[in-house]
Regions:
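Long helical/loop segments within the catalytic core of UDP-sugar-dependent glycosyltransferases
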Residues: 6-92, 104, 125-164
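Catalytic donor-sugar/metal-binding loop of nucleotide-sugar-dependent glycosyltransferases
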Residues: 101-117
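Active-site donor/metal-binding and catalytic loop motifs
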Residues: 113-127, 215
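Nucleotide-sugar-dependent glycosyltransferase catalytic core
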Residues: 122-137, 224-225, 254-260
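Membrane-embedded multi-pass helical conduit in multi-pass membrane proteins
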Residues: 168-253, 269-334
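The conserved acidic donor/metal-binding loop of glycosyltransferases
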Residues: 1-3
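Acidic donor-binding loop at a coil-to-helix junction in glycosyltransferase catalytic cores
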Residues: 92-98
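Structured alpha-helical
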Residues: 269-473
């Protein structure tokens, strides 16, 4: 499910001139938008959730020779792989464990932080969860295998990365506590912090500001702290269930290979995965209405000692509610009507129909068709529905038979939707190279800053696109 760029081997194979290198890993990048961003209508604004790992974590691990093999977008020395008995199959994932075997065998893994391939990410929330839960279980299984000698054959820097990974695997526990704690405090009348707002801001504000900016700076603005919390919140409770399973039976079979290319044909709310968040959100609304509404309406007297710190509790509850609301909205799968993905490739082209020539350029392009902007000097009135012709991509030397689906004309330009037909194997190969095998502008990593990410998250709640969008069959 990954397509290498034409310069992939040129940028990676040279490392193997040095005999110490056993594997060269490159980042994974995806041509279809992350399901969170797509469902929220933010496809062109927000990065994939793996940006933090490939843009920040992997380069950090590279400094200590502890890079993780990620299953795709890498090159491995065959003799090194054979020396450890081939790919490791003792866990539910093989890539991470194989890289550990290489490292414990005295090997060295390099990381080239350069986009050299494109792949397909999961398109549905359930598939995303299944993939991430399988990764979580595979990461935990490493510490139960006796033939992976992490603590005896790795140096202390490499061991430190594995210790940090253990803490990362238990991050859903911390996330669950942060979601439930303010709710329990409100219902049981025990404020987690007995302090005034100025006192709290004096200590907490510098940390919050530093964390937000340092997180963005250290990741090259590839991922914001707030957007990262949406991912963690959506993943939290399913991950807790998997963690409990792993602690009871580490090698229980709970996941299969990730489905790719599967698209939703109707709106799917995924209540089975998000109902814990919906329950917490409902209890939050009920608690705020009864607790603070009772004070405001005079139903019960204010206890001054109990009320100390309640302003902070209120802000905590509202913030959690916003993050949970975005996580729930992002989990509502929206139907996909296109059979293939389209990309905003602009290239000069020539359309020939019935001995008439139309010049223009592509607005977007896919393996199945394209949208054209045509020169108004042509006789666009002669362009009709279902006409057959030949579309030539002048710069690429590629010509494909096509059919006109729609045509329209404005004051200066004309537009036409084209569907390819009778595409040969050679033509399809050229289309794939044109679409996937080079670093075009739309494939560059998205880098929203923290403020933009927060505003997009707040706007997503008010717009409620996943709920309000109406899709006709």
């Amino acid at each position: 499910d990954f397509v290498p760029f034409t310069n992939f081997l040129m940028r990676t194979v040279g490392f193997f001139q040095n005999p110490k290198y056993d594997l060269v890993q490159t980042p994974q990048f995806f041509y279809n938008p992350d399901y969170h961003a797509r469902n929220l209508g933010l496809s062109n604004k927000m990065p994939n959730d793996m940006e933090h790992f490939f843009g920040h974590v992997q380069p950090s691990r590279d400094n200590g020779n502890c890079v993780i093999c990620c299953g795709t977008s890498y090159v491995v020395r065959r003799s090194s792989l054979e020396a450890i008995g081939g790919y490791y199959t003792g866990c539910c994932v093989e890539d991470y464990q194989t890289s550990i075997k290489l490292l414990t065998n005295g090997g060295c893994i390099a990381y080239v932080n350069e986009l050299l391939s494109m792949g397909e990410s999961t398109r549905m929330f359930a598939d995303f969860l299944d993939q991430r839960l399988r990764w979580l279980q595979g990461n935990m299984q490493v510490y139960y295998r006796k033939d992976l000698h992490i603590w005896t054959k790795l140096n202390w820097i490499q061991k430190s990365f594995h210790v940090s990974l253990i803490f990362f695997c238990f991050n859903p526990v911390v996330r669950a506590i942060s979601l439930v704690m303010p709710l329990l405090s409100m219902f049981f009348g025990t404020a987690p912090l007995i302090t005034s707002v100025p006192e709290y801001l004096f200590y907490a504000a510098p940390f919050a500001i530093a964390f937000t900016f340092v997180f963005g700076w250290s990741t090259g603005d590839r991922l914001s702290a707030v957007w990262n919390e949406v991912y963690e919140t959506a993943f939290c409770f399913p991950a807790l269930n998997r963690l409990f399973l792993v602690l009871r039976n580490p090698f229980a079979k709970a996941s299969t290979a990730t489905r790719k290319g599967v698209k939703a044909d109707r709106k799917n709310y995924n209540f089975n995965q998000t109902y814990p968040l919906l329950i917490i959100m409902s209890l939050t609304v009920i608690g705020i209405v009864f607790h603070y509404g009772g004070y405001m309406l005079g139903f019960w007297a204010i206890n001054q000692h109990e009320y100390a710190g309640k302003e902070i509790l209120m802000v905590w509850l509202i913030y959690n509610f916003i993050v949970m609301a975005v996580a729930v909205l992002s989990s509502i799968d929206q139907p996909v009507r296109r059979d293939v993905d389209r990309f905003p490739l602009c290239t000069f082209c020539k359309l020939t129909i019935d001995d008439r020539v139309y010049w223009g350029y592509t607005n977007d392009l896919s393996e199945g068709g394209t949208s054209l902007t045509l020169n108004k000097n042509n006789e666009l009135s002669n362009l009709k529905h279902d006409q057959e012709g030949l579309l030539e991509f002048v710069e690429q030397g590629l010509a494909i038979r096509c059919t006109v689906l729609r045509a329209a004309s404005s004051d200066r330009f004309g537009n036409a939707s084209i569907k390819f037909r009778d595409v040969t194997l050679e033509q399809n190969r050229k289309l794939i190279v044109l679409l996937y095998c080079s670093l075009e502008w739309w494939k560059e990593r998205k880098k929203p800053n923290g403020l933009d990410s927060f505003l997009e998250i707040v706007a997503a709640i008010f717009k409620c696109k996943p709920l309000l969008n109406v899709h006709k069959n």
